[in-house]
Design a protein with these regions (language model features):
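Glycine-rich phosphate-binding loop of actin/hexokinase-like ATP-binding domains
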Residues: 232-290
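ATP-binding/phosphotransfer module of carbohydrate and carboxylate kinases, centering on a glycine-rich
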Residues: 1-94, 99-131, 139-166, 286-420
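Glycine-rich phosphate-binding loop and adjoining helix at the ATP-binding site
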Residues: 128-161, 165-172, 177-235, 369-380
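Solvent-exposed alpha-helices and their adjacent loops that cap or buttress functional pockets
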Residues: 90-91, 99-102, 164-165, 228-232, ...
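Short, acidic, Ser/Thr-enriched surface-loop or helix-capping motifs
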Residues: 123, 181, 250
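Short secondary-structure boundary segments
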Residues: 175, 241-243, 292, 361-362
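Short glycine-aspartate micro-motif
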Residues: 97, 107-111, 119, 168-172, ...
Length: 420
């Protein structure tokens, strides 16, 4: 397994010290110094003034002035630094460091999907203080349904944390499909009845709060960048396989959405001319071969009619159980999906050359999709002359991880609003 650079990890941990990228991106160097100080302190959890000054290449006097202003405004606080073990016996005043004041503001992240909605609240330090998931009654919804569900979810999670809406600085919402982040519009979503919806404006008007919306795969990528394996990586790609296939890309420690903001739609890249029908209405998309509805469609050839449930999850579990029991037709369905996934991953490597690919999503419980021969096929399909094989890691999944990424997007926006 090591020769194929395949690792299984649970990458998002609430207890990780600090949050956010541990390296400064090119864009961050262009932001106001107070914001840069906040980013460095938040990333390290607790850090000495002198270390912040060195990382930002500013003078001690400038750092003292900046930290004093941020302390007076309630954004950071002084805290005792733990001495190195060799200095435990030293006398004198313990060294003083800086830490983020968690109560300076709260941010809410929400994932809306066709089966369930989830929410996470972060304090200003990026610590998770609450989470909640709710099942969805109807799969297809109107924009007003989405607004109503979002507001109800926010009210419910605030009750569980004893916070008021006035404590919240910003909200971010993720949905699958084509999302114009800059314009705040949902161009297409598989469970929304309308297209080209100004969802950000609808939510802001209803919530009376600053709102950001984004494609849910981007939010999963932000979760890795802020809380997971991406914190210490300059560039990487995240590929998710659930009800659809999504992708997020980080370059120079920043999430990239494409030149016009609608890129990284790996699931709708074409892998077969006039191929299988995708839920987007076109044929030959990668998603149409490896997403859950694609596997269910193929399952009709392997399962008896009585075994095919209206519940996608139950049908897939039955198909998987048969494959594990040695049924060759069931195994062939997963094997075929794995080959298409290998093709898609090879295209990611060829186009973007990421330092690593992080695979996530509920469908990864089916190891046939990422077993050794799948990763070997990915490397075989990649132009490898002089190229080190790209590592592939299998990461944790679950609705709360997506919502935590949304909360990171909201926290990033809240920081811009507060540190101006």
């Amino acid at each position: 397994m090591d020769t194929l650079q395949l690792n299984r990890q649970h990458s998002v941990h609430a207890e990780t010290l600090g949050c956010g990228p541990t390296f400064t991106s090119t864009r961050q160097h262009q932001t106001p110094l107070p914001r840069q100080v906040i980013d460095v302190v938040r990333a390290h959890g607790t850090i000495a003034r002198g270390d912040v000054a060195r990382k930002l290449d500013i003078s001690p006097a400038t750092m003292t002035s900046l930290s004093a202003d941020l302390i007076n405004n309630g954004f950071i606080a002084e805290t005792e630094l733990k001495r190195p073990q060799a200095q435990d016996s030293l006398r004198g005043r313990p060294p003083v460091g800086l830490t983020i004041s968690g109560t300076a503001g709260y941010s809410i992240g929400i994932k809306i999907s066709d089966q369930s909605n989830s929410a996470v609240i972060l304090d200003f330090a990026g610590k998770k203080v609450g989470n909640l998931s709710q099942s969805v009654v109807q799969a297809q919804r109107s924009p007003n349904d989405i607004v109503r569900e979002t507001r109800a979810l926010i009210e419910a999670i605030l009750r569980t944390t004893n916070l008021a809406i006035s404590d919240v600085t910003a909200v971010a919402v993720g949905v699958p499909g084509m999302v114009d982040f800059t314009a705040g519009r949902v161009i297409w979503c598989p469970f929304m009845q309308e297209t080209d919806v100004a969802l950000r404006d609808l939510l802001q008007n209803a919530l009376k709060l600053p709102v950001r919306i984004d494609n849910d795969a981007n939010l999963l990528t932000l979760a890795e960048l802020w809380f997971g394996a991406g914190r210490h990586r300059e560039n990487f790609a995240v590929v998710s396989i659930e009800h659809g296939v999504g992708m997020g890309l980080v370059i120079d420690h920043e999430l990239r959405r494409g030149g016009m903001g609608l890129g990284m739609e790996l699931g709708h890249s074409k892998v077969q001319m006039d191929g299988a029908l995708c839920r987007c209405g076109r044929r030959g998309c990668l998603e149409a071969y490896i997403a859950d509805y694609a596997l269910v469609r193929e399952a009709s050839t392997a399962l008896k009619t009585a075994q095919i449930s209206p519940d996608t999850h139950e049908t897939l579990e039955t198909l998987y159980a048969q494959a594990k029991a040695g049924d060759q037709v069931s195994k062939a369905i997963f094997s075929r999906a794995g080959k298409y996934l290998a093709m898609g991953l090879a295209n990611v490597v060829t186009l973007f050359d990421p330092a690593a690919i992080l695979l996530s999503g509920e469908r990864l419980k089916f190891e046939y999709l990422y077993e050794e021969n799948v990763i070997a096929e990915m490397h075989h399909l990649t132009f490898n002359e002089g190229r080190t094989p790209t590592p592939v890691e299998i990461h944790a999944w679950g609705d709360l991880i997506w919502a935590q990424g949304a909360a990171a997007l909201a926290l990033d926006h809240a920081t811009d609003l507060l540190i101006s």
